[in-house]
């Protein structure tokens, strides 16, 4: 029987007998026969990314801020943006990072409006489209302010579903178009309804949409007390629904809305109190991510019939609010076969809506209503990109010299298993090799638990078995890439509802990815990983990393199409807070962009404070403890005063920094100031953004 030494000839025999196809010890030449266009196809960028994202000739992701109207010199290299804002000599912001592109947001609004304008004009529809943005999708102040500003020319409004949301919507719309709708949805109490009625006193175009029949009595009573004539809408439960995850809010058993019986009671009560003229809007919602225009047309036609019936009953109807449902193509397939895809364009969606409403209204000789939609996902998803870094990867392959442990002191049973394994290897019998590997490992684990084997012996067997498995091509080729991110904070929908988003390296796209991997986050939670990807993949093509990162450099990944809901839903699991945020406009500068706003992510103090801790008191407690005289065996002499300063500085830095891994040490003054002030503004007017500069105290151009 051969000697039981890991560095003996059997290992060389194994590797010469079996030629592993899935594991190669050679480094793949990533530049050979590879191009950005091949990466674009591999990651489906041309599918989900068009017309806003593309792989450029440098192998980086480019952002096309004006969509299909973007000129070649207006492309923004995403990698250059990341380098600018993370450079210690610049802003020195820490990852993870959200990059917002207001130009993309503006283009999405304009494309949505243009799609409906074209459908209305081409079909001879005798009214107009007037959309609203549901603030629940992303309540960020600057996003909402941008939407109100960008949409002012076509009366674009807001939708609110809670008291804080109606407060922010009212405040923002004071600077918007006075005809813009403020649609008030959600469950309501007297305070909520009073706020909505107060909005009408402020000459805001506020509509109170009844979600429950009981809300009507409050509206009647409070409007009379406040001497305000309300505009009332009602949400109907349609029979039409779709079968996907997001269809659960529709249909007769949906969470929201009124049945036909309840609608008739509302109409009768309004008529009795002389307020039937106040009923002017019908709202419904089939569900988010409507997969096809066929389903959309069915739902809109049903709602249009109900709209016409309300007109017949004497209501002064003016608006049909089709709710959300305008989907985006997360996987780029345009198939509509899952919640990740929709089988239509903006133009096809608008055409289907207009045609359905027009057909029913013409049949009933009813005046065409204003069409409103609440298309939040379609508006904000594209404009925001989450950037994070892979900090390490699981070892792809090991060599025999990685486990040079002498295998001595084993039982006869273990030696027998080894002899069987050796014989199977010499015969080239892969199936038997796997069987004997399992037997050998199990027997050694039992010996370790009983105390008859030491850790060195167990490690030697583990290394031997792992090498054999790789040599016969039976090992799992998928690596684990550890990323500086919290899935629960930044991608909560992946954990919560298995929502998938495109994830792509934002650079090195001119090099062939030589590995496949899953992503594991920083949290101490087994669910903190991403192991499902678009296209039905359970791993992602990635570039190899060594101990110094990706080929000696840093490796950046981007999650795209996550501008809706992810920030609003993110928590602070393990006390990992929100990422840093920058706002980037296309400009005529040398790099084609200007950073117009930067916000450092939540510090450790911020997330502690959110959980009712007092960071200032915690700092003083720890500092005081460090200053107390203590008896210890450390006889080393040192400057005690300087030690106290070092401790205080270390504590302050830990409280003020983000909880994520810090990959670079930065003493940048801007970083320190951001930690203290939380936000910077720059002169957006100088960047072509038309912003007001009186409160803005810095500029940072690419």
From Swiss-Prot:
Q: Where, per UniProt, does this protein localize? A: Plastid, Chloroplast; Cytoplasm, Cytosol
Positions marked as site (Stacks against the aromatic ring of pyridoxal phosphate and stabilizes reaction intermediates): 285
Null allele phenotype: Increased levels of lateral root branching.
Which cofactor is essential here?
A: pyridoxal 5'-phosphate; Mg(2+)
Predominant localisation class: plastid
Report which reactions are catalysed by this protein: L-arginine + H(+) = agmatine + CO2
Question: Could you tell me which residues carry N6-(pyridoxal phosphate)lysine?
Answer: 136
GO terms under cellular component: chloroplast; cytosol
Q: Does the keyword Plastid apply?
A: yes
Q: What does the record say about induction?
A: Induced by freezing. Induced by the bacterial pathogen Pseudomonas viridiflava.
Q: What's the name of the protein?
A: Arginine decarboxylase 1, chloroplastic
Note the subunit structure.
Homodimer. Only the dimer is catalytically active, as the active sites are constructed of residues from both monomers. May form a head-to-tail homodimer. Homodimer and heterodimer with ADC2.
Annotated source species: Arabidopsis thaliana
* Key words, A-Z: Chloroplast, Cytoplasm, Decarboxylase, Lyase, Magnesium, Plastid, Putrescine biosynthesis, Pyridoxal phosphate, Spermidine biosynthesis, Stress response, Transit peptide
**Paired cysteines (S-S):** none
- Record-annotated residues binding pyridoxal 5'-phosphate? 288, 325, 374-377, 565
Listed GO MF terms: arginine decarboxylase activity; protein homodimerization activity
Class of enzymatic activity (EC top level):
lyase
């Amino acid at each position: 029987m051969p000697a039981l030494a890991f560095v003996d000839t059997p290992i060389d025999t194994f590797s010469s007998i079996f030629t592993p196809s899935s594991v190669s010890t050679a480094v793949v030449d990533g530049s050979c026969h590879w191009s950005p266009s091949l990466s674009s196809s591999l990651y489906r960028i041309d599918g989900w990314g068009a017309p806003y994202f593309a792989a450029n000739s440098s192998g980086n992701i480019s952002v096309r801020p004006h969509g299909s109207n973007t000129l070649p010199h207006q492309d923004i290299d995403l990698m250059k943006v990341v380098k600018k804002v993370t450079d210690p000599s610049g802003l020195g912001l820490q990852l993870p990072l959200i990059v917002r592109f207001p130009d993309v947001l503006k283009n999405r609004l304009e494309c949505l409006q243009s799609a409906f304008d074209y459908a209305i004009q081409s079909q001879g529809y005798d009214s107009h489209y007037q959309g609203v943005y549901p603030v629940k999708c992303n309540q960020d102040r600057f996003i909402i302010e941008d939407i109100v500003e960008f949409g002012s020319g076509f009366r674009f409004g807001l939708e609110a579903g809670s008291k804080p949301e109606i407060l922010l919507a009212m405040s923002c719309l004071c600077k918007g178009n006075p005809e813009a709708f403020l649609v008030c949805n959600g469950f309501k109490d007297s305070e909520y309804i009073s706020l909505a009625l107060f909005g009408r006193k402020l000459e805001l175009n506020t509509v109170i949409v009844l979600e429950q029949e009981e809300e009507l009595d409050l509206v009647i009573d409070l409007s009379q007390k406040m001497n305000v004539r309300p505009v009332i809408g009602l949400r109907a439960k349609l029979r039409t629904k779709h079968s996907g995850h997001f269809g659960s809010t529709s249909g007769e058993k949906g969470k929201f809305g009124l049945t036909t019986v309840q609608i008739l009671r509302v109409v009768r009560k309004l008529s009795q109190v002389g307020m039937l003229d106040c009923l002017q809007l019908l709202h419904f919602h089939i569900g988010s991510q409507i997969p096809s225009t066929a389903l959309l047309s069915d739902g809109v036609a049903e709602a249009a019939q109900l709209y016409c019936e309300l007109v017949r009953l004497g209501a002064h109807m003016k608006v049909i609010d089709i709710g959300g449902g305008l989907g985006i193509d997360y996987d780029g397939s345009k198939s509509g076969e899952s919640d990740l895809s929709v089988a239509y364009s903006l133009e096809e969606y608008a055409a289907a809506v207009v045609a359905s409403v027009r057909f029913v209204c013409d049949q009933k000789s009813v005046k065409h209503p204003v069409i409103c939609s609440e298309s939040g996902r379609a508006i904000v998803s594209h404009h925001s990109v989450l950037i994070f870094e892979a900090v390490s990867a699981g070892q792809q392959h090991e060599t025999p010299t990685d486990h040079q442990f002498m295998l001595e002191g084993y039982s006869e049973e273990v030696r027998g298993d080894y002899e069987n394994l050796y014989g199977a290897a010499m015969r080239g019998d892969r199936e038997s090799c796997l069987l004997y590997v399992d037997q050998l490992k199990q027997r050694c684990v039992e010996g370790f638990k009983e105390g008859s084997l030491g850790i060195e012996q167990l490690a030697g067997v583990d290394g031997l078995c792992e090498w054999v498995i790789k040599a016969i091509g039976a090992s799992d080729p998928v690596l684990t890439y550890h990323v500086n991110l919290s899935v629960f904070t930044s991608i909560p929908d992946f954990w919560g509802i298995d929502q998938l988003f495109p994830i792509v390296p934002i650079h090195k796209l001119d090099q062939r990815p030589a590995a496949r991997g899953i992503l594991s986050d920083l949290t101490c939670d087994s669910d903190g990983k991403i192991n499902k990807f678009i296209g039905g993949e359970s791993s992602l093509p990635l570039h190899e990393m060594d101990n110094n990162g990706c080929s000696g450099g840093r490796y950046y990944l981007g999650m795209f199409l996550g501008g809706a809901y992810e920030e609003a839903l993110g928590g602070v699991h393990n006390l990992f807070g929100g990422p840093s945020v920058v706002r980037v406009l296309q400009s005529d500068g040398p790099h084609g962009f200007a950073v117009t706003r930067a916000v450092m992510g939540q510090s450790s103090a911020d997330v502690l404070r959110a959980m009712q801790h007092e960071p200032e008191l915690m700092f003083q407690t720890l500092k005081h403890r460090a200053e107390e005289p203590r008896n210890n065996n450390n006889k080393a002499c040192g400057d005690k005063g300087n030690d106290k300063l070092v401790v205080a500085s270390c504590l302050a830095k830990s409280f003020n920094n983000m909880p994520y891994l810090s990959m670079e040490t930065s003493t940048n003054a801007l970083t320190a100031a951001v930690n203290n002030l939380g936000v910077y503004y720059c002169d957006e007017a100088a960047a072509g953004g038309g912003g007001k500069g009186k409160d803005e105290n810095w500029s940072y151009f690419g």
